[in-house]
């Protein structure tokens, strides 16, 4: 029986083209592969039981996949492949209980997210936004009021040493700064080999000039960066959130920024997405913001689609996909 795959429509550009380009789709049309595919005709925010009854595999970007998604009487789907590394939008256990596996793209995202974190750091350290304004507004003589920060005498703190955290330490090492890492689940020798020092989260918050979060969102990491931990940071330090919005208590962060408890922040993610029009962060000139897409590049999406669609192809051929998310 032909394996039928649906791709969520939010993976299309406004012009109707695949956002990741056409080349990865060639994986679904290999000679000898009994598979057909389509972009799902409906635009949905949650995968419905009807869709789970229609397709053998679904490639998902932002729509949620919940227990309700697999509650229908005619469940056909056997694999949900996430276009991305995070899977907080997927009820992995509920799917597994129904015999549906979940995959993600942990390898493809490592370099792009790490580069995006460094983009925030370099822009904040170099005072890029205000210097752009000075130039455009003919305020040239004010430039000595906005001295940037050199990095060789600073400390980078990385919270979470998974694939992205490791890649970030690797890319950041040539700057010659001190690098701290907080992750109780990673062997200290791994961190040392990357040039970092393993410390507690509290010590990392106290000592770092730039704190970068790269952890997955779950009940244990929700509001991991709270008011108490923000209060530990240097007044000259910056927080960079590249993970998920709820990793940081956003109200506590706003309070810390207003009070001058920390110097600023770079945020690619928010507790509410899209960000509300009245969110105070939008009016803060010491905060850089991106719409959960700073790592999005042509290479990033191409590699993600290859990895994610590759999982579906492997499954359709009776092979075990490389990046199955374990429930629980």
Residue ranges and their predicted role:
Residues 1-55, 316:
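N-terminal glycine-/charge-rich "phosphate-binding" loop or analogous flexible N-terminal tail
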Residues 102, 236-328:
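Rossmann-like dinucleotide-binding domain for NAD(H)/NADP(H)
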Residues 83-84, 100-111, 183, 201-202, ...:
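Short beta->alpha connector loops at strand-helix junctions that form conserved
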Residues 165-166:
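N-terminal Rossmann-fold NAD(P) dinucleotide-binding loop
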Residues 98, 106-155, 170-174, 324:
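Phosphate-binding beta-alpha-beta segment of Rossmann-like dinucleotide-binding domains, i.e.
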Residues 65-70, 185-280:
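Rossmann-like adenosine-cofactor binding region
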Residues 161-162:
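Glycine-rich Rossmann-fold phosphate-binding loop(s) that bind the pyrophosphate
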């Amino acid at each position: 029986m032909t394996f039928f795959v649906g791709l969520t429509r939010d993976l299309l550009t406004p012009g109707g083209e695949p956002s990741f380009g056409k080349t990865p789709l060639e994986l679904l049309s290999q000679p000898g592969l009994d598979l057909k595919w389509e972009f799902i005709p409906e635009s949905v925010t949650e995968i419905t039981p009807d869709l789970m009854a229609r397709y053998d595999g679904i490639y998902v970007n932002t729509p949620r996949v919940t227990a309700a998604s697999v509650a229908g009487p005619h469940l056909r789907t056997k694999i949900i492949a996430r276009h991305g590394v995070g899977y907080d939008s997927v009820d992995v256990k509920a799917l597994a209980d129904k015999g549906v596996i979940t995959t993600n793209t942990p390898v493809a995202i490592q370099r792009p997210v790490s580069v995006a974190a460094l983009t925030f750091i370099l822009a904040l350290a170099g005072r890029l936004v205000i210097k752009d304004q000075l130039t455009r507004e003919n305020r040239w003589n004010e430039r000595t009021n906005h001295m940037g920060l050199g990095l060789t005498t600073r400390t980078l703190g990385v919270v979470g040493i998974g694939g992205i955290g490791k890649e970030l330490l690797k890319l950041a090492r040539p700057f010659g700064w001190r690098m701290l890492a907080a992750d109780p689940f990673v062997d200290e020798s791994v961190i040392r080999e990357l040039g970092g020092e393993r410390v507690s989260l509290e010590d990392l918050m106290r000592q770092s000039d730039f704190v970068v979060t790269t952890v997955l969102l779950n009940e244990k990491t929700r509001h991991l960066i709270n008011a108490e931990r923000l209060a530990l940071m240097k007044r000259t330090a910056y927080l960079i959130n590249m993970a998920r919005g709820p990793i940081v208590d956003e109200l506590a962060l706003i309070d810390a920024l207003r009070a001058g408890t920390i110097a600023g922040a770079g945020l690619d993610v928010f507790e509410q997405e899209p960000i509300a029009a009245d969110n105070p962060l939008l009016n803060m000139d010491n905060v850089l913001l991106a719409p959960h897409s700073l790592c999005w590049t042509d290479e990033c999406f191409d590699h993600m689609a290859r990895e994610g669609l590759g999982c579906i192809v492997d499954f359709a051929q009776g092979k075990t996909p490389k990046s199955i998310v374990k429930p629980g």
